[in-house]
Structure formats: C-alpha cells, structure tokens
Design a protein with these regions (language model features):
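Extended charged/polar low-complexity repeat regions
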Residues: 1-422
Length: 422
C-alpha cells in the first residue's frame, strides 16, 4: 500500500482508502480491483488490472448503464478502453426509483412502488409478476401478503409483536416462525406440525439446534468466534484446530485430517486419516498450478494473465486446452485426444450453439428465464419446451417424433405433482 493509504482488512479482503475515499479492493495475493472516479467523485470504472473493466454511466447522479470494456490498442496507437457490450441498463421514475432493468438482449424487469417508496410489484422478463401488501410504514413496514400472477402463490402473514409470525399458504397450510428480541429465528413449525428449535449465545452465534425428531446438534466456538467443535447428537463429534485464522487440524473420532497452508491461507499439503499426502502449489495470483497425489502423479494447470485456464496437464500425461473470447467466455475446448468442441454464446452468456468434435452441432433457444425453449440435435431433430403462466417451470415437452410430455405443479411451493406421458 502507498504511504498515504488507509487499509481496512476484513477476512481475506483488504479495502484501500486515500483521503477517506475507497480506491481499491485487494485479496491476500494483492490482486486488485481498482475504483476510478469521475470529477464528481462517483465510481466511474471498476478495473481488474488485466485489461477488463466495467464502466458505470450516470444521468442525474443515477447509474443508467453498465458496460463491459476491453483495453485495446490499434497498431502503435495508445491503449484505450473500448466497450465490448452493454451488460445492463436502468430506468427511473420522477422520484428516482428504479422502475426498469434491461439486460444485454433487451429483456426487462419492471418495478412498481407505493407512495412510501415501498415495492408493490415486480414483473419478471418472462411475464410472471409478484405483488406485495404491507402494514405500517418506514423501517417498521412488514409484508402481510405476497402473491403472484399465477394461482399457486398467495401467502399471507399474521404478525405478533412478540416476534411470532404465522404464514398462511394458498393451499390452506400454515407455517409458524418465532424470533427472539434480536430477530433471530428460535423456532419453526412446519405445515405438518414438525418443530425445529435454535439457540444462540450472547454474540449471536448458533449454539444448539434440535430437529423435529429430537436430535440435538451443538456448536462450540473459541474467543475469536471460530467453530472449534461440532457435536451432532448421535454421531461422533468433530473438532477443529486453527492457526492464523485457518483450520489446521480436523478430528472426528479416531480420524484426523491435517492441513498446511501458505501465507495467504491456501492449502499446500493435506494429510488424510490414512496418512496419504496431497500437495498443492499456486502462482503469484493465487491460482492453483499443481496437485501432487499420493501415488506421485501430478496434475498441472496453466493460466493466462486474465485468470483463465488455458491448459491442463493430466496425471495420465494427457493435455486439455481451452480458448476464450474477449468477454471471458469459453469458446473452444480440446480434450486429451485432440478432439475439439466449439461453443457459441448469446449476449447474456447462454449457450446457443455447440459444435462437436466430428463437426455436427446442436443449437439452443431460450426464454427470458434462461430456460431452453427449443433444442436442435445433430440430426436436425427439434425438441420444444413450453412454460405455463409466465413461469420458469416446464409445462410441456414436445418431442421431435411428435409425442409430448406434460407437467403439472399444483401446490403452493410449485413442486411437480403430475407427469403425463403419451
């Protein structure tokens, strides 16, 4: 860090401040995400230091778009940031509330609020809508009904001031949740009457839980809040020994696992209960580069400067290779026999074409939930998929031979209840 930097550490993340402003976030290997700001002090760019960044665009002090950019140079010209694609766009109403979010292929979610700026409706890109009704206002607001545009979901909440809430589901079933004064769940009663209990210590850590069958699991912590013992009731207890904040030894009955770590906390040697040793090595960025197994075989991994896996040298001597596009998506894979598979993706990272080693291909189409609606196989046969009520759950599969399979979801949890197969 620079002499004028303030660094705050939290777990394996380090937050770097200069003049009271966050300028970068780093990990134990000093990989850094840099935050570049505009003249107004707003975060304008998130730069990973490897030629890739996210550009944040603003209007009226609100983020309206996020662009994925690549650092490029043409010929001998200086490097400049070029937008590879827009990832997401945002729209707001006159009160500054988010009302629409649109992804790279134009699929949009929409939002509606009450006059207290509490959300009332969320409409998904696939067509389904969710609604909320509230009681009270401000930070005391709590949901009393949550329902959807499809009939299976309509849930009502009956709150009591002692931390107890009863959930009434659309199918007539009920669930009960009981919280303590610090809003921690201490009891849950399932629709079938099964009861779960939880207890906590004065620091908010879970110490005991009991399942509906009466089995009790207990947890024990050290002064730093690290789990040092787990007592699973009728099973053997497990203990954990720590060193510099990381687990060094695990004991369960007579079995013992031991771990050696580097300065960053990654495991460099693992010894199992049989005394078998596995070693691990890492590069300067913290990526795994080698695994040495107990039989003395070795698995090596090669990475590029952008953190992408380029090559695997397998223990049997075979080599796998990988290629990526400018958006970081894998576009080709070569197996240990030299056979190559090619992948094509849409703008939101959904696989749309797969070219197999023999040259045949499979193609896929999707709905806004990322679910397949059509699949063309190597012989040109097309299988279609339909989804009812604007949901992500398949309602009918249309096979290439003309047959079909129907699916029904009839309960409040949208679980599959019936399959009709021709």
């Amino acid at each position: 860090s620079a002499p004028d930097e303030l660094v705050l550490a939290q777990a394996s993340r380090f937050y770097h401040f200069r003049d009271g402003v966050l300028v970068s976030i780093s990990d134990a290997y000093d990989n850094r995400l840099r935050l570049c700001r505009d003249r107004s002090g707003r975060i304008e760019r998130l730069d990973n230091g490897a030629g890739r960044s996210l550009l944040l665009r603003y209007e009226l002090d609100r983020i309206v778009a996020v662009d994925y950019q690549v650092h490029r140079a043409k010929g001998r010209e200086p490097y400049v940031w070029e937008t590879e694609q827009n990832l997401v766009s945002y729209a707001y109403d006159e009160h500054g509330r988010l009302v629409c979010a649109t992804n790279a292929v134009g699929e949009s979610e929409r939002y509606r609020y009450d006059d207290q700026h509490v959300i009332l409706e969320r409409q998904l890109a696939g067509g389904a809508s969710f609604f909320w009704a509230w009681e009270r206002s401000g930070k005391a607001a709590r949901c009393v009904r949550h329902w959807a545009s499809f009939s299976q979901m309509d849930t009502r909440y009956a709150w009591r001031d002692d931390g107890r809430v009863t959930v009434h589901n659309a199918d007539g079933s009920q669930e009960v949740y009981v919280h303590d004064q610090r809003a921690r769940l201490v009891q849950r009663i399932d629709p079938d009457g099964a009861t779960h209990f939880k207890s906590y210590d004065d620091k908010g850590r879970l110490t005991v839980e009991q399942d509906p069958m009466g089995a009790v699991t207990a947890y024990q912590y050290d002064d730093a809040g690290r789990l040092v013992a787990l007592f699973p009731g009728d099973d053997e207890p497990t203990s954990y020994e720590h060193d510099n904040g990381f687990v060094r030894v695990v004991r369960r009955g007579q079995a013992v696992w031991k771990y050696e770590r580097n300065e960053q906390g990654d495991v460099t040697r693992r010894t199992d209960p049989d005394g078998e040793v596995t070693d691990y090595s890492y590069n300067k960025h913290g990526q795994l580069t080698g695994i040495w197994y107990p039989d003395h075989s070795c698995h090596r991994l090669v990475w590029n400067e952008r953190g992408q896996l380029l090559e695997e040298q397998l223990p049997n001597g075979g080599i796998k290779r990988y290629r990526y596009d400018d958006l970081g998506r894998q576009v080709a894979r070569e197996d240990e026999h030299g056979a190559q598979t090619v992948y094509e993706w849409d703008s939101v990272g959904r696989l749309i074409r797969l070219v197999l080693p023999g040259g045949s291909c499979r193609e896929f189409s999707y709905n806004p939930y990322g679910k397949i609606i059509a699949e063309r196989d190597e012989l040109g046969h097309v299988t279609g998929y339909e989804y009812a009520d604007g949901l992500h759950l398949i309602s009918r599969r249309l096979n290439a031979d003309g047959t079909q399979v129907k699916y029904r979801y009839d309960n409040a949890r949208l679980l599959l209840t019936e399959i009709e197969n021709e």
